[in-house]
Amino acid sequence: MALIVGFLSLETRDSAAAEHSETTYSYGSHDRQKLDAFWNASDSKRPGVVILHGGYWYEDSGWATWSRHFADKGMAVFSVDYRLNFDAPWPAQRNDALSALTWIKANAAKFDLDPDRIVVLGSSAGGQIATSLATYGSGGDRIKGVVALSPVASPYRAWNDGNHDDSTAKERKVRDNATILARCFPDPADTDASLHASCWDTWKDMVVKNRASGADDAPMYLVHSEGDFVPVQHSLDLEAAEEVGHDMPADGVTVETVTGSAAHGGGLLDTAGMPEKVITWIKARV
């Protein structure tokens, strides 16, 4: 990504018709605190989609193609990078996403964006961050909703799933990187905060359902495949915490399983009809 200081872009790519723009901006001082903005010319304010990539919290993944797709559907799109697990422990990743949102809203006029009509889309590890934005504080006041594809909504569940003799390589990779994210192994007995932040408190904070509060949280559309290595139970547990534990309306969290598929994260958008479902869900809320 090209470095942008303040509001000045070092690189802007426009379409031949000068109707489409792509620019990289910095929303913080760390090299990872950048975002790519995609938008088309508009005579009116439009809704926004903030994309948080996956990659086990430790690597990046490209979202340019889908960012352009969503921009062509009438939205201003922001593909956000954040500090990875070897850069900083949790909750730095959630803090970065919050900072990016603040920057986007403050600069909404540049993109013909309505700052009150923003949805967050997260994939895999990015889905964990995205859903945490829905439940952290009054998420419903911050954003209009979250679409999460294979969200690792419970890194603790993922740690356990990856800690068996028959665990797959991908399950172990999630386990190991969740451990790096927390900077410790999950141990309910480790509650000592005198020398460090409590390990167990960090793991509990990483589990999205633990911050569920019902009506204060943003609505969510959570999607997994039937053979996903991040199983749908992650999202079902979050749905139960919101709708059963905290009386969120029954349509506050929608969980969908794509049958006959093992697609994961952004790969779910290659499923027939899924991009249309996602766009329909977003537009119904913005």
Say what each PLM segment does:
Residues M1-D14:
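Secretory targeting and sorting signals
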